[in-house]
Every structure is written in structure tokens, then in C-alpha cells.
């Protein structure tokens, strides 16, 4: 028997701040099977992924766990990553300067990973 569960991904650009006009556009699959890898991308407009003043985050929200910060990547003369302890062994967040975007990879997903996933600055 094959079991699947949904990964909800809002399709919208989120402006952050009245003056900044920064928009983030998420993309990725809506359905991932248990034990597979979830891969999501967040394209940035109005700012640079390698900005020295920004951090680029992935968060998720589910009825059972509420709002949960997963991790971030940021540039301060070199690249840094911070990850939530709950997913640290399964998560990778990578910047892509050539496409001005950053990505989330979550390995070995389970039904408990079912959530709405957001990227945020």
C-alpha cells in the first residue's frame, strides 16, 4: 500500500515592508510520499540573496505543531546556516546567487511534516 501526504505551498509573493518592495515566490511539489525528499525553492525580487543585512528563512505551519521555524541562510562575508533542532539531521538550506534564490531540502519526510511551508526574510 502506498501512503501519500500533502505539502501545502502558498502561491503568492509576500511584500516585506512598505518601502522595501521585496517579494518572495515559492515553488515546489504539492505532494511528497513518506521517506522521500521535499525540495522547495524561494525566488527573491527586490533584494539580493547575498545581502549583508538579510537572513532568508523557511518556516512551516500545521494544526498539530503550529508555526515552526525550520532554518535560515545568510551572508556575512561568508555563508552561514542555522537549523531548528527538530529537523537538523534532515534539513539543508542553500543559497543560489546565480538565480537569486534559496532552497529547502527536507529528507526522509513523514506524515508529521505535512504543513504549509513558507519562505520569509
Curated annotation (Swiss-Prot):
Cystine pairs annotated here are: 42-119
Q: Where is this region: Framework-3?
A: 82-119
**Keyword terms, alphabetized:** Adaptive immunity, Cell membrane, Disulfide bond, Immunity, Immunoglobulin, Immunoglobulin domain, Membrane, Secreted, Signal
* Record region (Complementarity-determining-3): 120-121
Region feature (Complementarity-determining-2):
73-81
Would you tell me the Gene Ontology cellular component terms?
Answer: extracellular region; immunoglobulin complex; plasma membrane
User: Per the UniProt entry, what are the Gene Ontology biological process annotations, in alphabetical order?
Assistant: immunoglobulin mediated immune response
Q: Cite the GO molecular-function annotations of the record.
A: antigen binding
Q: Where does it mainly reside? A: secreted
Give the Pfam families listed for this entry. Answer: V-set
- Subunit note: Immunoglobulins are composed of two identical heavy chains and two identical light chains; disulfide-linked.
This protein is called: Immunoglobulin heavy variable 6-1
Species of origin: Homo sapiens (Human)
